[in-house]
Structures are given as structure tokens and as C-alpha cells.
Amino acid sequence: MEMQSEFDRLLFFEHARKSAETTYAQNPLDADNLTRWGGALLELSQFQPVAESKQMISDATSKLEEALTVNPEKHDALWCLGNAHTSHVFLTPDMDEAKVYFEKATQCFQQAFDADPSNDLYRKSLEVTAKAPELHMEIHRHGPMQQTMAAEPSTSTSTKSSKKTKSSDLKYDIFGWVILAVGIVAWVGFAKSNMPPPPPPPPQ
């Protein structure tokens, strides 16, 4: 059932991406559409291997920056861009490189919160980002995320294995939180648009 749900999400956001691409060809200055496009790419990135995921996150970043060029005060685009930088952080083992993304994410979340202080999600994003460097170190303590994500069992002591599992759990908690939040924005964005939603999955 969970696999079916994941597949439905994949189909939905692929549909969203293609629809946004079509709309962009008709109106490249639609900031709402660019934001939805970036959000859909960010969602789809979690279904890809690490290298492809990084590229998709970069594409999402490009679309969100384009949206902000059209409308610099668009706080939902700022927030999504912060999530894109955060996603990039946890796929980047090098702390110096990751620090650049940390700073960009914090700046985006702060600007989004300043533009809409009543938005609880923006406030929580700022709080989580403040803890992100510590979580990043925990995740990459045993090597790059590619290794952390590997399914093969550890041949080291049970203590190290436990720590590795904890790191993996942390990674999925963080990445899952980011993706879930972006997914909510994308769903709401498409609900507000005139585009009919994709057909519901057949009853189980």
C-alpha cells in the first residue's frame, strides 16, 4: 500500500512538472507556475539516485530563482528555495561546501518569514535549519550519504552499526520533512490553479 502511495506521488509530481513546463512555454513570467515547477522537481528528486537527485535539485533551484526574478517578494518561492538548498546540504559530504548551502537556506527562510511572520511553517524551517549543521555532521560521520543509504549490513561492531542506522534514520527524517513540506506547497498550488487534478488511483 505504501509503495502504491509513493508511486501515486511520483505520477502526480511528474504530471505537475510536465504541466508547469507547458505553461512556461505559454507564459515564462508566471511566478506561481515557476514556483510549482521548482517544487515538483524538488519532490521528484527524492526518487532519483544521488547524482541525478543533485541535478534535479539544481534544476529546481534555477526555476525558483527565476520565479524570484519575476517577483522578488514571493515568500513561498523563497521558502521552497530554502528547502532546495537544505536538500543539497544533506547530499554534500564536504562541510565547507555544505556551509554555503546552510547560509543560503537560512537567508531564504529568514526572508520568507520576514515577508509572512504569521506562517508557522516558515518559523519551523528557520528553527530546523539552525540545527542542520549538527545533523549534517551526524549523517556524514561514517562517510558520504551514498554509503549511509546503502542497504548492505555493516560488518563492524554492533555499536557502529547502531550509529550508522541512527545516521540513516536522521537523514530520512530530515529529507522526508523537507520533501513533505514542499509537497504540501505543490499540492496547494495546483489546487488553486485551474488545471484539473490527475485522475485518482483505482480503488484497492
Swiss-Prot record:
The keyword Metal-binding does not apply. The N-terminus is blocked. Signal peptide: none annotated. GO terms for biological process: protein insertion into mitochondrial outer membrane. The chain crosses the membrane at residues 170-190. Residues 191-204 are mitochondrial intermembrane. Residues 1-169 are cytoplasmic. It is a single-pass membrane protein. One of its GO terms (cellular component) is mitochondrial outer membrane translocase complex. Coiled coil: none annotated. TPR repeats lie at residues 86-119. Residues 144-164 are annotated as: Disordered. It holds the Pfam family TOM20_plant. It is found in: Mitochondrion outer membrane. Keywords: Membrane, Mitochondrion, Mitochondrion outer membrane, Protein transport, TPR repeat, Transmembrane, Transmembrane helix, Transport. In mammals and fungi, the transmembrane domain is located at the N-terminus while it is located at the C-terminus in plants. The overall orientation of the protein in the membrane is therefore inverted. Central component of the receptor complex responsible for the recognition and translocation of cytosolically synthesized mitochondrial preproteins. Together with TOM22 functions as the transit peptide receptor at the surface of the mitochondrion outer membrane and facilitates the movement of preproteins into the translocation pore. Belongs to the Tom20 family. Forms part of the preprotein translocase complex of the outer mitochondrial membrane (TOM complex). This is Mitochondrial import receptor subunit TOM20. It comes from Solanum tuberosum (Potato).
